Amino acid sequence: MIAKHMIRTLMIETPSVPGNLGRVATAIGLLGGDIGEVETVKVGPNYTMRNITVQVENEEQLQEVIAAVQALGEGIRLHTVSDEVLSAHEGGKIQMKSKMPIRSLAELGRVYTPGVADVCRLIEKEPEKASIYTTISNSVAIVTDGTAILGLGNIGSVAGMPVMEGKAALFDQLAGISGIPILLDTSDPEEIIKTVKHISPGFSGILLEDIGSPHCFEIEDRLKEELNIPVMHDDQHGTAVVTLAAAISACRSAGVDLKEAKVGQIGLGAAGVAICRMFMAYGVNAVYGTDKSESAMNRLEQYGGQAVSSIEELMETCDIVIATTGVPGLIKPAFVRSGQVILALSNPKPEIEPEAALQAGAAYAADGRSVNNVLGFPGIFRGALNAKSTEINHDMLVAAAEAIAACTKQGDVVPQPLDSKVHHAVAAAVEHAALTAVK
């Protein structure tokens, strides 16, 4: 199935006769539309009004769906088509709000002047008390330069703000962390590093987000070396954690021993290199990779992986194949070997459709729709903050992946991303790994 990336809500009136909702659903489905939520808005004596959420690929397909619904006749009427995604973003998705009401002069004196001066003097004498008497201990900066926003590319940090707000909302809901978007108007590595270092006293962690390759590698490495708080580039390590979890689950379903398998990575950008490093940290000895960039291949070899010259060679060699190239249809069915596990993770369209891979002989196949970073970063940072860790290392990341895999039902590739139990499990595993490393 092809991933859909336009969502619209159709308000449709149907006569109160059995089968009319089915006719609407059939009309939408025949044109390739995916129906999401169906909400009953009003039930009248002779009709029912419903909001039906539909996902389509593009505007052309949307217009075809609209025309098909309008052509049904027999009392079926399309009233409105609305963009609820855009509506949800009006005014932004997050806000900074006081935890304390200020309703009297006495409360004002405690929250602000003159009382706050005593707290300031205490922190001046004992800086570690800032973790008790300020929000710093629970705040993470979400930093972007806007050079690699989702699948949209270099669109700038302001255009990427909705993504950063989404990350902040997920931090809050899934891990109780205050995520603060920081938009940078530079893509110069030195300026980014300097800026993040200057703002770091106000945070207990740094999440680097949608920063392009190759400068993302230098930025993360330098910040991890020069700061004493956790730093993680989510496009690299968040993706790698969830990919490893998916591979563990897939191998469990396919009866494959992951640590003894040959793992191949197609595409060695930020995510691809991190995935290779994650599998090596997990204990996989044979990790192969291929990319059209010679420097990317060299980078993989510096980390201990093996570069191969072509996709065909990698597919012929490896038991487990992961692809993050962004090129739809790159993996031809003829390349697939019997019994392979294939995770084609590019969105909105994968390198090979799971159905095509399975028909070609793969033992297990999945695409990127279910392999979502949301499963990783909230719990990873919650665990790191709980442990008061100064870093996020590969032991902590492997622990996160194993926790996600342990929460995955048999037959699924990963758990449901909004399941709070999963995020609690990830946080606990990461905290334990961090504290074990300290000992």
UniProtKB/Swiss-Prot annotation:
Q: Which gene encodes it?
A: mleA
Q: What is its EC number?
A: 1.1.1.38
Please verify whether the record's keywords include Metal-binding.
Answer: yes
Question: What is the role of this chain?
Answer: Catalyzes the decarboxylation of malate to pyruvate. Is specific for NAD, cannot use NADP. Can also catalyze the decarboxylation of oxaloacetate. Involved in keeping the ATP levels high.
Catalyses which reaction(s):
(S)-malate + NAD(+) = pyruvate + CO2 + NADH; oxaloacetate + H(+) = pyruvate + CO2
Domain named ACT: residues: 9-84
Molecular function (GO) terms for this protein are: malate dehydrogenase (decarboxylating) (NAD+) activity; metal ion binding; NAD binding; oxaloacetate decarboxylase activity
SUPFAM superfamilies, from UniProt?
Aminoacid dehydrogenase-like, N-terminal domain, NAD(P)-binding Rossmann-fold domains
Entry annotation: catalytic residues: Y112 (proton donor), K167 (proton acceptor)
Q: What SMART domains does the record tag this protein with?
A: malic, Malic_M
What InterPro entries does its record include?
ACT_dom, Aminoacid_DH-like_N_sf, D-isomer_DH_NAD-bd, Malate_Decarboxylase, Malic_enzyme_CS, Malic_N_dom, Malic_N_dom_sf, Malic_NAD-bd
Quote the protein name from its UniProt record: NAD-dependent malic enzyme 1
User: Where does the chain bind a divalent metal cation?
Assistant: E209, D210, D235
Enzyme class of the recorded protein, top EC level: oxidoreductase
